[in-house]
Amino acid sequence: MIAYLSGAVREVREASAVIVAGGVGYEVFCPASTLGRLVPGQPAELNIRHVVREDAQLLFGFLDTDSLRLFDLLIGVSGVGPKLALSLLSALPVTAVAQGLLSGDVKLLSSVSGVGKKTAERLVLELQNKVPEHLAAGAPVSAGKAALTSTAGRDAIEALLALGFREPQVRSVVAELLAADPEQSADALIRKGLGKLR
């Protein structure tokens, strides 16, 4: 099983990247926060979760071990596959997902595309006592929610989407910025967001 991959980034796609290692190109599915930091032609080191199914072998990659740890917890829940877990980690920062699970914030979790209320409730029920508290460190309880509901957050997301950036990356970056400072204006979020997305 592949647990770690080090190589050159050949291509960054919508939901994955191609990493060349030992002359072989591996397609690795990654959350938006990881994809946004991969640059074609540059080296990359990814923590890998190798998922084997009847019809395919899939690689999921993360720049940090916290994201991998949370991914493992999410896919351990009945009815939650790797793609849905990746959607959660793309739409919200790791700290916001962890905080949502710890605090039982079903509304926040179900605001992510593809995550219904019942799935969010099941995630909370099964993971509330399993998520390490350090994963939520530094995240105000409303951090993830702020990105999705504040006027500044919504305006910043709309503006960045209009500039052609991908929605999962935009939502992740804006949520991360608002988690650091919930009082930021839309202009500040757009300016800082552009710096992170380019």
UniProtKB/Swiss-Prot annotation:
InterPro entries: DNA_helicase_Holl-junc_RuvA_I (IPR013849), Hlx-hairpin-Hlx_DNA-bd_motif (IPR003583), NA-bd_OB-fold (IPR012340), RuvA (IPR000085), RuvA_2-like (IPR010994), RuvA_C (IPR011114), RuvA_C_sf (IPR036267). Residues 143-150 are annotated as: Flexible linker. SUPFAM superfamilies: DNA helicase RuvA subunit, C-terminal domain, Nucleic acid-binding proteins, RuvA domain 2-like. Residues 150-198 are annotated as: Domain III. One of its GO terms (molecular function) is ATP binding. HAMAP family: DNA_HJ_migration_RuvA. Belongs to the RuvA family. The RuvA-RuvB-RuvC complex processes Holliday junction (HJ) DNA during genetic recombination and DNA repair, while the RuvA-RuvB complex plays an important role in the rescue of blocked DNA replication forks via replication fork reversal (RFR). RuvA specifically binds to HJ cruciform DNA, conferring on it an open structure. The RuvB hexamer acts as an ATP-dependent pump, pulling dsDNA into and through the RuvAB complex. HJ branch migration allows RuvC to scan DNA until it finds its consensus sequence, where it cleaves and resolves the cruciform DNA. This is Holliday junction branch migration complex subunit RuvA. It comes from Deinococcus geothermalis (strain DSM 11300 / CIP 105573 / AG-3a). The gene is ruvA.
